[in-house]
Amino acid sequence: MKIVYDRINNMRGNLITITAEGVSLGELARIDLKDGRNIYASVLRIDGDQVTLQVFQTTRGISTSDQVTFLNRQMQAVYGDTLLGRRLSGTGLPIDGGPQVIGESIDIGSTSFNPVKRIVPRDMVRTNIPMIDVFNCLVKSQKIPIFSVPGEPYNALLMRIANQTDADVVIIGGMGLTFKEYQAFIENAETAGTINKTVMFIHRATDPAVECLLVPDMALACAERFATDGKNVLVLLTDMTAFADAIKEIAITMDQVPSNRGYPGSLYSDLASRYEKAVSIEDSGSITVIGVTTMPGDDVTHPVPDNTGYITEGQFYLHHGKIDPFGSLSRLKQLVIGKVTRDDHGDLANAMIRLYAESKKARERQAMGFKLSKWDEKLLTYSHLFEERMMNLEVNYTLEEALDLGWETLAECFLASEVGIKESVISKYWPEIAQISK
C-alpha cells in the first residue's frame, strides 16, 4: 500500500520539502495537482523525517495541499528497438510528436558495469576524421572529452563523428541546447541517413535544470542495455559544463556549502559516475563516451575540465575550428596502433606530428622577418598541406586512405631521408613521386 502525503512544507525553485518516512534516496514520487495534472519528482535529500524532492518540470501550479505519493521505485527509462530514431526529453518523454516508446522499463543512475566482466580494450572506433583516427585513435570503451571554448564548432564535430562512425548505435545526450542547436542535430541525422541508428535525449536551455541532470543517466542506461545485447554504442554528450552548472544550481538551492567556484564537493564523483559507464563487455558489445566540456574563458583549470581530466583517458582540444594536435591525447591509442591498424601507422603519425611542430618554428621565423632556409621553405609547404588535408574537420577519409595521404604529403615536401622514419618502413610505403626541387 502506498502512503499519500497531503502537506508540502516548503518550495524553493524546483525543490519541495515534505514530512515523510520510509522513503529512499532517488525514489520517484508523483504529485497530484488540484487541476488534475500529475508532476513527477525524485528524492534528493533525507534529513530525519524531512524529505526534499526535486521536481522534474516546474513547481508552478503546485500548492502546499497537493498530494504526494511515493512510487517505491527509481526513475526509469524505456528500452527497446522502438527507441531507435526517437527524440526524448530528460525525463524520457517523447518530444518528436511520436507515440510513447514501448519497451522494457530500466532503472537509471545504476552502478557501473561489473568489473569482472570488463575486458581490456582492443578495438578501434573509426570516425573517418584523420586527426582522430591517425593521430589520437578512439578505442572502444574509451571515455574522452572534447575541450573547447564556447563558440567553437564542437557540436558540428559531434555530428560528423555520429555520421561517419562505424558504431552500431549512436546515443546523443544534449544538455542546455538552444533551439538552433537542437534543430541542427535533427536535420543532420535526417540528412546523413543515420536517424535509424540514433537516439536523442535532449534538454533544451528553456527546460528546468533538474531535467539536465537526467540526460546523461537516461542516455547511459539505454546504452548499457544496447551493449549487453551485443551492440557497439557511441554516446555523445554535450555539454557537460551545462550538466555541472545544473548540479551547482541545485546545490545552491539546497544551501550546500560550495567547494570550488560555487560547485559542490561532489562534482568529481558526479562526473566520474557518468564517464565510468564506458565499457567493453566480454562476449558482448561496448560503450564509448565522448563528452564536450566547454571551458569558460579557455581556462583549463576551471573545476569542470580540471576534474574531467582526472577521470577520462585523454582529451581532444578544439581550437580555431581544428583539433589541436599538440594538446590532444588518447591514452589508449597504443592498444590499437600497429596492432589492429597498419604497421606503418605509428611511425607515420609520429613523423608527421614532429615535422608539423618544426613547421611552427619556421612560421615564427617567417613572421619575425628572418631569412628562411630551404628546409624552412619545405616545412612551410608541408604545414599548409598538413592543415588542409589532415586538420580539416570536413574531410571523410578511412584510416587507410588517411595513411596513404600522409605518405603522399611527406613525399611531396621532403626526401625519404629527411622524414626520420626507419628504412624498412620507408622501403615498403614511400610513394613513387618524382623528387623535384627537394
Swiss-Prot record:
Keyword Transport: yes
Keywords for this protein: ATP synthesis, Hydrogen ion transport, Ion transport, Transport
Gene Ontology biological process terms, A to Z: proton motive force-driven plasma membrane ATP synthesis
SUPFAM superfamilies in alphabetical order: P-loop containing nucleoside triphosphate hydrolases
GO molecular function, one term: ATP binding
Pfam families linked: ATP-synt_ab, ATP-synt_ab_N, ATP-synt_VA_C
The keyword Ion transport belongs to this UniProt entry's keyword annotation: yes
Family statement drawn from the similarity comment of this UniProt entry: Belongs to the ATPase alpha/beta chains family.
Its job: Produces ATP from ADP in the presence of a proton gradient across the membrane. The V-type beta chain is a regulatory subunit.
Name the record gives this protein: V-type ATP synthase beta chain
